[in-house]
């Protein structure tokens, strides 16, 4: 056993001691290896040691691989062309950006439509400051939605999408529209190149679809979606920057212009007039705003120097109209909850040049009417979220997948009920501000549940607070549905006759107009105890405690009225 141990130890010890003695001379054999060049193992280690330690000699063999790498990169230029990128024209780049921007908007619209969730209209999304090519983006979104069912059927027949592009369906829909129905053939972009490789399969799928549907053209597949909706182009003059006559003179150089009979600062142009890129629109001298939207602020009739609250203000067209009607004087508090819509609101205010608007990023229902900062509010404009059923064509909602001939304007009853509950709360909250004299409630809906029913449910509370219904625009012929006494004061617009559906109700505090006697007020107000009698019944209450006690009773009474009316 000793012999066995000694035999392997001896060579190991020899190697260890020889290796230990060679700690100092180890570098010389490493340097001698490239010079000797005798043993086959030494030249294998020498290049590695040369590359690591010999700075000058190692760079010489390294440079050829480096050059080969750069030459390899040069050889890839025809495959991923940096040189061809420089040859892209500005039109190609603009089309590429427009397709991406259109895909983002299409994704938002389709997601909201699938979830039956209210989102901004296509026009509002396109007019966002982040969208550069507004005209091209708007056209792509509208045309893709028009042909969307056909595009989906063609993609199902062709079966060319993999998992990667199925996750980017909005962009695929946009590019497929350009390939199948567009004027320009897309040439740059990953999605464009992928679908162009399958162009023949897509065209073959379209031909197969026509045969299956037994039609001769794509127009027969689309049906009613091709029917146009001729509506005049309305333009509101921003009187903070320009007077109406000057705007008429400028626009008459290229268009036929008429002044609207209802709203003084509103102009009427022929249908199809495209003013998105007009100089007056770009510098905020005129705004593309519909007639119904312009009538809302005009119905409120705010006076110069007033403090006005715009409860749901984004995107801001009605807000800046209020500022123009007030001649830039007084103060407007623009309240908006959504952060993205606040940005749009601020951009609109900046473009208009209005300096008397203060943006409040928060929930209107969360505002305290007794807060000293709202003590001087004399007018409130309330245009809350609604179904938008009166502006389906204007919003282009008729292009969405959920819209059909059989289900035209047929909204979910549960969603309508939720909207109506919110609208009642918002209107009751607006009427509770102590110094407010005028309140306008408006919707772009045609449904009674959002219009007359909301007003009638809040009317007892409004009467107890001294409000009555007034008649905005007495010359207007179309009035509210005759479902309660006083509905003739309400204003309606018909989506067929007036090209858009709208509803306006105006509340005016009665004691600010004629100071009625106590016997003329509702019985609920007459039964209120006078303050002197209460102080006699409770002599131990100091005035401060009495005010707190009476305020509590007032809040309880308001809650009782709201609960009784289903708010």
Swiss-Prot record:
Alphabetical list of Gene3D superfamilies matching this protein: Sun protein, domain 3, Vaccinia Virus protein VP39
Entries under PROSITE patterns matching the protein: SAM_MT_RSMB_NOP
Protein name: 25S rRNA (cytosine-C(5))-methyltransferase NSUN5
A Pfam cross-reference name: NSUN5_fdxn-like
Reactions accelerated catalytically: a cytidine in 25S rRNA + S-adenosyl-L-methionine = a 5-methylcytidine in 25S rRNA + S-adenosyl-L-homocysteine + H(+)
EC number: 2.1.1.-
Active site: 444
Region (Disordered): 1-88
Gene inactivation effect: Reduced methylation of the C(5) position of cytosine 2268 (m5C2268) in 25S rRNA.
Lineage, top ranks: Eukaryota, Viridiplantae, Streptophyta, Embryophyta, Tracheophyta
Sequence positions that bind S-adenosyl-L-methionine: 312-318, 336, 363, 383
Keywords: Methyltransferase, RNA-binding, rRNA processing, S-adenosyl-L-methionine, Transferase
Classification via InterPro entries: MeTrfase_RsmB-F_NOP2_cat, MeTrfase_RsmB-F_NOP2_dom, NSUN5_7_fdxn-like, NSUN5_RCM1_N, RCMT, SAM-dependent_MTases_sf
Entry function: S-adenosyl-L-methionine-dependent methyltransferase that specifically methylates the C(5) position of cytosine 2268 (m5C2268) in 25S rRNA.
Species, as recorded: Arabidopsis thaliana (Mouse-ear cress)
GO biological process: RNA methylation; rRNA processing
Segment forming the signal sequence: none
Family in the record: Belongs to the class I-like SAM-binding methyltransferase superfamily. RsmB/NOP family.
PANTHER family in the record: 28S RRNA (CYTOSINE-C(5))-METHYLTRANSFERASE (PTHR22807:SF4), NOP2 YEAST -RELATED NOL1/NOP2/FMU SUN DOMAIN-CONTAINING (PTHR22807)
GO molecular function: mRNA binding; RNA methyltransferase activity
Basic residues bias spans: 1-17
């Amino acid at each position: 056993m000793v012999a066995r141990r000694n035999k392997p130890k001896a060579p190991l010890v020899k190697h260890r001691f020889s290796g230990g003695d060679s700690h100092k001379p180890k570098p010389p054999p490493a340097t001698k290896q490239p010079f000797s060049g005798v043993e086959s193992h030494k030249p294998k280690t020498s290049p590695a040691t040369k590359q690591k330690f010999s700075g000058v000699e190692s760079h010489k063999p390294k440079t050829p691989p480096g050059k080969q790498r750069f030459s390899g990169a040069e050889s890839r230029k025809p495959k991923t062309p940096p040189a061809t990128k420089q040859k892209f024209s500005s039109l190609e780049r603009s089309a590429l950006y427009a397709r991406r921007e259109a895909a983002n908007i299409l994704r938002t619209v389709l997601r909201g439509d699938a979830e039956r969730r209210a989102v901004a209209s296509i026009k509002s999304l396109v007019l966002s400051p982040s969208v550069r090519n507004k005209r091209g983006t708007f056209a792509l979104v509208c045309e893709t939605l028009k042909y969307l069912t056909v595009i989906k059927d063609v993609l199902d027949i062709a079966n060319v999408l993999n998992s990667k592009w199925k996750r980017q369906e909005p962009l695929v829909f946009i590019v497929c529209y350009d390939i199948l129905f567009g004027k320009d053939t897309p040439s740059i972009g990953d999605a464009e190149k992928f679908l162009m490789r399958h162009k023949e399969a897509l065209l073959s799928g379209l031909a197969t679809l026509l045969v299956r549907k037994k039609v001769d053209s794509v127009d027969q597949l689309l049906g009613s979606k091709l029917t146009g909706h001729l509506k005049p182009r309305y333009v509101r003059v921003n009187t903070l920057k320009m007077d109406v006559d000057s705007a008429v003179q400028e626009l008459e150089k290229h268009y036929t212009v008429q002044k609207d009979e209802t709203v003084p600062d509103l102009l009427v142009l022929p249908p199809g007039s495209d003013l998105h890129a007009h100089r007056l629109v770009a510098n905020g001298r005129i705004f593309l705003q519909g007639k119904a939207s312009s009538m809302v602020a005009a119905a409120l009739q705010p006076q110069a120097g007033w403090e006005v609250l715009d409860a749901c203000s984004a995107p801001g067209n009605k807000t800046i109209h209020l500022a123009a009607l007030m001649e830039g004087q007084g103060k407007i508090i623009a309240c908006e909850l959504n952060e993205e819509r606040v940005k749009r609101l601020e951009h609109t205010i900046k473009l208009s040049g209005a300096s008397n608007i203060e943006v409040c990023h928060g929930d209107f229902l969360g505002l305290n009417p007794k807060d000293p900062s709202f003590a001087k509010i004399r007018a409130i404009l309330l245009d809350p979220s609604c179904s938008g059923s009166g502006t389906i064509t204007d919003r282009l909602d008729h292009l969405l997948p959920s819209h059909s001939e059989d289900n035209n304007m047929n909204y979910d009853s549960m969603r309508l009920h939720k909207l109506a509950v919110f609208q009642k709360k918002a209107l009751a909250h607006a009427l509770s501000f102590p110094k407010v004299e005028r309140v306008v409630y408006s919707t772009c809906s045609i449904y009674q549940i959002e219009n007359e029913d909301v007003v009638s449910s809040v009317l007892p509370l409004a009467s107890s607070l001294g409000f009555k219904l007034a008649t905005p625009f007495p010359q207007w012929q179309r009035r509210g549905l005759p479902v309660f006494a006083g509905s003739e004061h309400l204003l309606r617009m018909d989506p067929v006759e007036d090209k858009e559906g709208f509803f306006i109700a105006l509340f005016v505090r009665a004691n600010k107009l004629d100071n009625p006697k106590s016997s003329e007020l509702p019985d609920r107000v007459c039964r209120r105890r006078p303050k002197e009698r209460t102080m006699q019944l409770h002599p131990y209450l100091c005035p401060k405690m009495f005010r707190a006690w009476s305020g509590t009773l007032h809040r309880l009474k308001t809650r009782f009225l709201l609960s009784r009316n289903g708010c």
